[in-house]
Amino acid sequence: RDFLIKAEKNNIPISVISSGMKARIEENYLGKKANNNTVITNGTKKNDENDTKFIREEGTLTKEKFQEYYSDCLNQNDLYPKLSDTYAYLQHSKKNGKKILFFVGNITKNKNQMQAVEILKNTKVFENTLLVLWGREVDNGEVRKKIVEYQLHKNVILGGFNDRMDIFWKFCDVNLFLSLNDGFGLPIVEGYMHGVPCVTFEDLDATQDLYYPEAMLKVKDRSNESVTDTLKTALDKNWKYEEIIEIGNMFSIDIMSEKYVNWYKEVMA
């Protein structure tokens, strides 16, 4: 806080990763517009990895066997299915018409995976939908307990940390991003780069910079009803894969680097 005030007072150039973050600094710390503050959005890199080692023979892990195996995992803290098994299950589910949601990020109160679980509890609406939560548990197992309590082992998968996300995005229909607060929302961009649309809250810092109607539906408020309605719309919508990829490419690591270099040159001129 003190640094931000001093930087504005002395016209010291700083950069932030989203327009929403800039607006919050101006409103909460400075009380006015900051001419020294430049927005340079985050970037990421798409890796075109080979998935050969994840492909297994048809029928080696049936749907029933995976669900039984996953139920056993749920009842033990910090235990997850093998990535290769989850890959096979998602591949099978996709082939059989399931709609698949991803929610990427460590499982915390702020990331708000709990709300996604509460929404998937409505199995009448989301009977044909599978949600995968990717990330380490940093919530003392609260989300895990809720999945067990609601008997959602057929609808919500705790996937754990996934260092091969690039080969999994092809299974995803919609990327959920329901954080309470978030500076930029890198998982949104990662999804875009693979042609995956996003459902997120209208009031997040990330939304202002990452909203494109071709790639995102915004939830107007934070109620379960609003998220459910928006998610249903997203799952029924005919998204254009290539258009979303083009939007994702606007946030590549190369473009981010170029913006920083140009900003630095401008500051030093």
Where are the language model's segments positioned?
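Short alpha-helical donor nucleotide-sugar binding micro-motif in glycosyltransferases
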Residues: 161-162, 168-172, 260
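Nucleotide-activated donor-binding/catalytic signature segment of Leloir-type glycosyltransferases, i.e.
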Residues: 143-162
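Glycosyltransferase donor-sugar binding loop
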Residues: 104-108, 129-144, 161
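A short, active-site helix/loop in glycosyltransferases that binds the activated sugar's phosphate group
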Residues: 4-37, 44-77
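Conserved donor-binding/catalytic core segment of Leloir-type glycosyltransferases
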Residues: 15, 58-111, 117-120
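Aromatic "clamp/platform" in nucleotide-sugar-dependent glycosyltransferases that forms part
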Residues: 180
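A charged, aromatic-enriched C-terminal amphipathic alpha-helix characteristic of glycosyltransferases
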Residues: 238-268
